[in-house]
């Protein structure tokens, strides 16, 4: 009967402790700093406030009246920045 081919893994010495062969990796378990969370939620809240103010009194505020429909872009843009920041939150 023909003998099976021996692979490299079968000829390598087997350690009694499998974790001894691994390189330790330092894990940063500190999480997200407080300032990151504050800025993230601030972007979302300021964007929402911008849209609410624009809807309620936008035509009465001179610079908001000049911006016109760009107020929606500014409000939603601020909220999207906050939403994108949630991807880095741990």
From Swiss-Prot:
It holds the Pfam family CrgA. One of its GO terms (biological process) is cell division. The keyword Magnesium does not apply. It is found in: Cell membrane. This is Cell division protein CrgA. The gene is crgA. Residues 1-25 are annotated as: Disordered. Involved in cell division. Residues 9-22 have a biased composition (Polar residues). Belongs to the CrgA family. One of its GO terms (cellular component) is plasma membrane. Its main location: membrane. Keywords: Cell cycle, Cell division, Cell membrane, Membrane, Transmembrane, Transmembrane helix. It is a multi-pass membrane protein. The chain crosses the membrane at residues 38-58, 67-87.
């Amino acid at each position: 009967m023909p003998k099976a081919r021996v692979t490299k893994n079968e000829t390598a010495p087997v350690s009694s402790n499998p974790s001894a062969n691994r390189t330790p990796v330092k894990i940063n378990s500190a999480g997200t700093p407080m300032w990151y969370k504050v800025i993230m939620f601030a972007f979302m809240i300021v964007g929402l406030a911008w849209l609410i103010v624009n809807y309620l009194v936008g035509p009465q505020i001179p610079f908001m009246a000049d911006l016109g429909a760009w107020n929606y872009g500014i409000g939603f843009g601020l909220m999207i920045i906050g939403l994108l920041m949630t991807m880095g939150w741990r």
